[in-house]
A protein has these predicted regions:
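Bacterial N-terminal signal peptides that target proteins for export
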Residues: 1-11
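C-terminal segment of classical bacterial N-terminal signal peptides
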Residues: 15-25
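Low-complexity, acidic Ser/Thr/Pro-rich repeat tracts that form intrinsically disordered stalk/linker regions
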Residues: 25-40
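Short, T/G/N/S-enriched strand-turn elements that build extracellular solenoid repeat scaffolds
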Residues: 40-42, 93-94, 149, 192, ...
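Structural signature of tandem-repeat unit edges
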Residues: 49-57, 76-89, 99-112, 122-135, ...
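Extended Gly/Ser/Thr-rich low-complexity repeat segments
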Residues: 58-77
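Consensus positions within tandem repeat domains that build extended binding/scaffold surfaces
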Residues: 91-94, 115-117, 137-140, 158-161, ...
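Short, surface-exposed terminal/edge motifs of secreted or surface/virion proteins that either
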Residues: 320-325
């Protein structure tokens, strides 16, 4: 038994030697590399900080795991990335799935963040926005922890670029081209404001967010398909005069209790305010002020409550009631009342 203990002790010491000889954290190294002719990088293993020094456009990592781009070797360690001045665009997929990344520092002069650049960086919560930034391409900040970011001066937001992010509020710029589902599934998003002049709310723009109320400005002409679909905390929506088209499923499966359709509306899309659950819709009151609705989708207010009241222009009561009763699945007890606006 004593001999066995001695053997185990020797084995233990042999295994312990590498640990005893290991360099302390205070002697952590700085690793360096180069990519293409215009980019150098360094990684400090003590601070877990990556510094990118690039002149012009950063190379794309379209494979997402291109180890020729040496900084990718530290995707599971890097906590902070600093870009030095001189870079004009961040490459596609450049920091895809950097699992520990928490902070990004961007310089003035940066114009474009290309697609998937920070996609999957689920711990990323701190980032500044340079005044020169114009374009954020698709999927850039998918599922990150960022709570707020300025969108001022942006010219384009790519599809799903903030999908699943932890944003709490956004201010939508008037002159920015906004592609599909930009804020889809941002469950923490409660507040949205629009700069004067916004003309369109795009497809799925706020789908499945935590918005509780929304005021759509008169400059908006079209509310896109699925724009506010499945926003189950949305209890109040003001659609101002100026809106012409409310698209398919624009407000389907929300918690709206009443809604007013302004006089400028000419198109109501299929399922625009439909509740598709087995439970009845929350809508109790609908006011239709428009006398010029030319296109009606089916089931605009489908699966309604039995106490729903829809107010329509008196001059259009017969026409609108026929459409609503025949194509919209109103409860038998729902009332349609003519009003002289």
């Amino acid at each position: 038994m004593t001999k066995m203990k001695t053997i185990f002790a020797v084995i233990f010491l042999v295994l312990l030697i590498p640990v005893l000889l290991k360099a302390p954290e205070s002697e952590a190294k700085v690793y360096r590399g180069k990519c293409k002719s215009n980019l150098t990088w360094s990684y400090d293993s003590k601070t877990k900080t990556m510094v990118i020094d690039c002149k012009g456009d950063m190379p794309d990592d379209e494979q997402f795991y291109d180890l020729d781009m040496g900084w990718r070797k530290y995707y599971f360690k890097t906590k902070k990335v600093i870009f030095k001045k001189g870079i004009s665009s961040i490459g596609a997929g450049a920091f895809y799935n950097f699992q520990k990344l928490e902070e990004v520092v961007l310089p003035e002069g940066l114009r474009i963040i290309k697609y998937d650049a920070f996609d999957g960086c689920r711990k990323l919560q701190f980032i500044n926005k340079p005044s020169t930034l114009e374009v954020i391409e698709k999927d850039v900040f998918w599922d990150v922890k960022i709570k707020s970011i300025s969108l001022k001066n942006l010219k384009k937001l790519g599809s799903e670029c903030f999908s699943g992010a932890k944003l709490q509020s956004v201010d939508i710029p008037a002159k920015c081209k906004i592609e599909d589902s930009v804020f889809w599934n941002c469950k923490k998003l409660k507040k949205v404001t629009f700069e004067k002049g916004v003309k369109r709310i795009s497809y799925g723009m706020f789908r499945e967010t935590g918005i509780k109320n929304i005021d759509i400005p008169r400059s908006v002409a079209q509310i896109g398909t699925y724009a506010f679909a499945n926003c189950q905390s949305l209890k109040k929506a003001i659609i101002n005069e100026g809106v012409k088209k409310i698209s398919k499923d624009a407000f389907s499966n929300t918690a709206l209790e009443e809604i007013t359709i302004p006089s400028t509306v000419t198109q109501l899309g299929k399922n625009a305010f439909r509740w598709e659950s087995t439970e009845k819709s929350s809508l109790k009151k609908v006011v239709i002020r428009s006398q010029n609705i030319k296109k009606w989708g089916t089931m605009v207010f489908g699966a309604t409550r039995d106490d729903l009241v829809i107010y329509v222009p008196q001059s259009k009561k017969a026409e609108y009631e026929k459409i609503l009763r025949s194509t919209n699945g109103l409860d038998f007890h729902a009332k349609i009342v003519g009003k002289n606006w």
